[in-house]
């Protein structure tokens, strides 16, 4: 007898999705946004069910995501941004707090928060992860959101 397996799919066209986007490093972030929107639309989500909400930077994304989750209007939140390491400890603070804050929002409100915030050592790595050699992490985050919406709906139906 096979083991029972529950897993999400990339088909959740009825969902509403909020993209919470940090504007800092916009030359990279806009590629993440394009990748996320394209992935959602290719998997059946209407553009009318996608809202882009812009925050100043990655550090502010968790608070905006929290407010979005509180509204209860969206099935998933996709956080997009880019934190590029510099010569000071600033990178660790911003990347760490953004990560912790987004995880907290997801757990507190039971809403999937897909992590598409690049935390990289160089501009070259950011460019690679926003649509060139290493794929588009915005598109990957959107697919994670779709899968989580599908998975949670199955778990809630049980």
Swiss-Prot record:
SUPFAM superfamilies (alphabetical): Lumazine synthase
**Which catalysed reactions does the entry list for this protein?**
(2S)-2-hydroxy-3-oxobutyl phosphate + 5-amino-6-(D-ribitylamino)uracil = 6,7-dimethyl-8-(1-D-ribityl)lumazine + phosphate + 2 H2O + H(+)
Gene3D superfamilies attached to this UniProt entry? Lumazine/riboflavin synthase (3.40.50.960)
Q: Which UniProt keywords apply?
A: Riboflavin biosynthesis, Transferase
> HAMAP family in the record, alphabetically?
Lumazine_synth
Per its database record, what is this protein's job? Answer: Catalyzes the formation of 6,7-dimethyl-8-ribityllumazine by condensation of 5-amino-6-(D-ribitylamino)uracil with 3,4-dihydroxy-2-butanone 4-phosphate. This is the penultimate step in the biosynthesis of riboflavin.
| Assembly and interaction partners | Forms an icosahedral capsid composed of 60 subunits, arranged as a dodecamer of pentamers.
* PANTHER family, A to Z: 6,7-DIMETHYL-8-RIBITYLLUMAZINE SYNTHASE, 6,7-DIMETHYL-8-RIBITYLLUMAZINE SYNTHASE DMRL SYNTHASE LUMAZINE SYNTHASE
Q: What is this protein called?
A: 6,7-dimethyl-8-ribityllumazine synthase
Q: What organism does this protein naturally occur in?
A: Stutzerimonas stutzeri (strain A1501) (Pseudomonas stutzeri)
The taxonomy runs: Bacteria, Pseudomonadati, Pseudomonadota, Gammaproteobacteria, Pseudomonadales
The gene it comes from is ribH
């Amino acid at each position: 007898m096979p083991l029972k397996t529950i897993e999400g799919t990339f088909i959740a066209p009825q969902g509403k999705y909020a993209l919470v986007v940090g504007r800092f490093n916009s030359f990279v972030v806009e590629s993440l946004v394009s990748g996320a929107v394209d992935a959602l639309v290719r998997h059946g989500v209407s553009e009318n069910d996608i809202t882009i909400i812009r925050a100043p930077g990655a550090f502010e994304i968790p608070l905006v995501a929290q407010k979005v989750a509180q509204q209860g209007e969206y099935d998933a939140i996709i956080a997009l941004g880019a934190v590029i390491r510099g010569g000071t400890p600033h990178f660790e603070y911003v990347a760490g707090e953004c990560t912790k804050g987004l995880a907290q929002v997801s757990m507190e409100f039971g809403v999937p928060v897909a992590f598409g915030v690049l935390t990289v050592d160089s501009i070259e790595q950011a460019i690679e992860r926003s649509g060139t050699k290493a794929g588009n992490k915005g598109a990957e985050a959107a697919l994670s959101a779709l899968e989580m919406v599908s998975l949670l709906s199955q778990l809630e139906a049980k």
